[in-house]
Amino acid sequence: MKSPYPEEFNRQAIGLTASLHFAPTQKAADALLKEGKDPEQIFVTGNTGIDALHYTVRNDFYHPETEWAKGSRLIAVTAHRRENLGEPMRYMFRAIRRIVEEFTDVKVIYPVHLNPQVRKIADEEFGGCDRIHLIEPLDVVEFHNLMKASYLIMTDSGGIQEEAPALGKPVLVMRDTTERPEGVEAGTLKLAGTKMEDIYRECRQLLTEPEIYRRMSEARNPYGDGTASIKIRKILENIDA
């Protein structure tokens, strides 16, 4: 229940009162069965977050930051988890800076979390590097289009692990564990950990080995095909009928 917190706490608390469970994957449905949920109340639909990309991602989207990154290999970064605060986050950021300093065609855009501790570390570790832009948090439309414009994603966030693969973007997860094991198994995600050398090595591999990049970017997203909301609506209509 504590890992990841508060997401797992919220999931279990809501699950106690829910009469229907719409699971994004079969593995998630199996987990609900192990918790004792009624199998007749569990439906595998995919994740509605993938559906949203059909409405938020646009070919004509304009943002000055993505314009700045045109012609480069853009890495979108997010980092904010409380378990990474302190030294783990510093190591993560140092690995990213090392990549930028080594590869002159790489630029980084990092919408920095509002947590003052995160901002302090980001300023200290990324300061003075003109190919790393620290920007204010983006809204969902802006961020989805940032992901689309990116070459790869480096994150410790949860939902991004499901959304980015739907856009064909490899995801390096800067954590030691993930609650999205389906993505790792499918090959859309790779756990890079929180050690500087490990993160640097995994990122460098994606930048220098086209076949590995291709396999990750073309892997099938296990979290749905963008039709979860349609499936849920049909289920609800049949229940109400």
Model-derived features with residue positions:
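Nucleotide-activated sugar donor-binding and catalytic core shared by glycosyltransferases
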Residues: M1-Y110, N115-A241
